Amino acid sequence: APALLCALFACGMQIAANFINDLYDYLKGSDRADRLGPERACAQGWITPTAMKRGIAGMLIFSCLIGCTLLQQCWGQLPHGGWGLILLGLLCVIFAFLYTTLLSYKGWGDLLVLVFFGFIPVGGTYYVQAHSITADVWVASFICGLVIDTLLVVNNYRDREQDALSGKRTLIVRFGEPFGRYLY
């Protein structure tokens, strides 16, 4: 059951982060008409910013309820109770906002993907089941984070010109197209 709860928490947080990204890129004007990639709900007028904020709140509440259920199941079995899980959950919520509102525009996207799609979900899921972390788990977490980061890299490569115009300083915008090909 802890692994399923971890998966539900991760899915809920991913949906919340996608909603936050859609809303704040729209509010910042990053989702222009010449944008490549999938259409965005706020930019297309399919959903109002107010409704998107409600969706964000709903997904965060859902994720926090899942997190509380996980804590209830694991509390007392983990070293230090479950305080580490509380900290990880809070970091997930905080960085879901910071990623789009600030950090992705400053070139921190790749590092954050490595942490929040590698170390936290893989290491966290292992930890709540085994009650410890091993070097193998750190390696597996790192590899999973790198695999997921290739999706960000390919999107940033595709969007490099629009990102530059929007003020997004991704690694590919900073270091150029040849670097992007190498990074991928």
Task: For the regions a language model picked out, list residue spans one by one.
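Transmembrane helix-loop junctions in multipass membrane proteins, especially transporters and channels
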Residues: 22, 26-30, 72-79, 101-105, ...
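Intramembrane alpha-helical segments
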Residues: 38-132
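Solvent-exposed interhelical
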Residues: 20-61, 145-184
